[in-house]
C-alpha cells in the first residue's frame, strides 16, 4: 500500500511539474504578444497624431502665406 502511495505521488508530481512549466511558458508568450500589440497600437496612434499635426501645420501655413500676400499687395498698392 505504501508503495502505491509513493508511486501515485511520483506520477502526480511528474505530471504537475511539466504542466506548470507549460503554463508559465504560455503566460510568457501571451505577455509578449500583449506587449507587441501595445507597441503597434502606440505606433499607429503616433502616426495618426503626426498626420494630424502635419495637416494642421499645412493649414496654418496656407493661412499665413495668404495673409502675408495680402499685406504685400496692400503695401505696394
UniProtKB/Swiss-Prot annotation:
GO biological process: defense response to bacterium
Record note on what altering residue 21 to I does: In frog brain
Segments for region (Disordered): 24-45
Cellular compartments annotated: Secreted; Target cell membrane
Annotated InterPro entries: Frog_antimicrobial_propeptide, FSAP
Tissue expression profile of the protein: Highest expression in skin and to a lesser extent in brain and intestine.
Protein keywords: Amidation, Amphibian defense peptide, Antibiotic, Antimicrobial, Cleavage on pair of basic residues, Membrane, Secreted, Signal, Target cell membrane, Target membrane
Endpoints of the signal sequence: 1-22
A cellular component annotation (GO) from this entry: extracellular region
Residue positions where Glutamine amide is found in the record: 76
Propeptide: 23-42
A Pfam family that the UniProt record links to this protein: FSAP_sig_propep
Biased composition (Acidic residues): 30-40
Any further remark recorded for this protein: The sequence shown corresponds to the dermatoxin isolated from frog skin. A variant of it is present in frog brain.
Family: Belongs to the frog skin active peptide (FSAP) family. Dermatoxin subfamily.
Protein task: Possesses a potent antimicrobial activity against Gram-positive bacteria B.megaterium, C.glutamicum and S.aureus and mollicutes A.laidlawii and S.melliferum. Less active against Gram-negative bacteria B.cepacia, P.aeruginosa, S.typhimurium and S.meliloti. Probably acts by disturbing membrane functions with its amphipathic structure.
Protein's name according to its UniProt entry: Dermatoxin-B1
Species annotation: Phyllomedusa bicolor
Lineage: Eukaryota, Metazoa, Chordata, Craniata, Vertebrata
Amino acid at each position: 500500500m505504501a508503495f502505491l502511495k509513493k508511486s501515485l505521488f511520483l506520477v502526480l508530481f511528474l505530471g504537475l511539474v511539466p504542466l506548470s512549466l507549460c503554463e508559465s511558458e504560455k503566460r510568457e508568450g501571451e505577455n509578449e504578444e500583449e506587449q507587441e500589440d501595445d507597441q503597434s497600437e502606440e505606433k499607429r496612434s503616433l502616426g495618426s497624431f503626426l498626420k494630424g499635426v502635419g495637416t494642421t501645420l499645412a493649414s496654418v501655413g496656407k493661412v499665413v502665406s495668404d495673409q502675408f500676400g495680402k499685406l504685400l499687395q496692400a503695401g505696394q498698392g
